[in-house]
């Protein structure tokens, strides 16, 4: 069993092209909220568990561990995104200089303790958070969810525009696909 270190998390969720990328930066702009993270491996782990490719307990453990590690790495400046045009880039954050200076911070458990006391809020963008809500409640009870709903006609039009539906041909596929065994 592994308990999460960081319990103040806002999960901005919705289907592809629902508007998460507009809402998450607004959440991140609030005081004491970290810059938004896209941690898509969490979706993959939960989908694998939901499809019974891995067991639920393993999925919960992996997600707790991955989120704690990702949030800690964010706090010490590891894996910083310097791509100017990306929505998770430090150049789109409210505190660009502070985020860049984190690479100079001495790492260690004191960072975790400091941010637990400070009640730092982490913001992450994910797909299918409400569909897989049962899994999320097992990760931590304190997470807050903002589920984005969009007119389905507009959503499907955006999917068509972005090539979603031809997902099998996309190299960086975020959807879990399995071949049928005959």
Model-based region annotation:
Residues 31-37, 160-163:
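A generic secondary-structure signal for well-formed alpha-helical elements
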Residues 1-9:
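Extreme N-terminal, non-catalytic leader segments
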Residues 20-34:
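A conserved segment at the C-terminal end of the G1
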Residues 1-2, 23-24, 111-113, 135-136:
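Short, flexible, glycine/charge-rich loop motifs used to bind or transfer phosphoryl groups or to couple energy/partner
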Residues 112-182:
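PAPS-dependent sulfotransferase catalytic domain
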Residues 12:
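Hydrophobic anchor at the beta1->P-loop junction of P-loop NTPases
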Residues 17:
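Walker A (P-loop) phosphate-binding loop of P-loop NTPases
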Residues 38-124:
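PAPS-dependent sulfation machinery
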């Amino acid at each position: 069993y592994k308990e999460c270190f960081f319990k103040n998390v806002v999960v901005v969720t919705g289907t592809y092209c629902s508007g998460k990328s507009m809402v998450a930066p607004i959440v991140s702009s609030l005081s004491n909220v970290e810059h938004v993270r896209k941690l898509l491996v969490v979706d993959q782990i939960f989908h694998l568990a939901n499809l019974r490719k891995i067991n639920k307990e393993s999925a919960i453990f992996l997600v707790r561990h991955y989120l704690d590690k990702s949030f800690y790495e964010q706090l010490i400046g590891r894996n910083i995104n310097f791509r100017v045009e990306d929505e998770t880039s430090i150049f789109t954050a409210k505190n660009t200089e502070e985020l860049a200076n984190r690479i100079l911070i001495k790492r260690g458990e004191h960072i975790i303790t400091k941010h637990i006391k400070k009640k730092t809020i982490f913001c992450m963008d994910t797909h299918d958070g409400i569909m897989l809500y049962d899994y999320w409640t097992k990760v931590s009870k304190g997470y807050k969810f903002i589920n984005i709903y969009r007119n389905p006609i507009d959503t499907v039009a955006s999917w068509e525009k972005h090539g979603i539906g031809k997902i099998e041909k996309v190299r960086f596929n975020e959807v879990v696909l399995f071949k049928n065994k005959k």
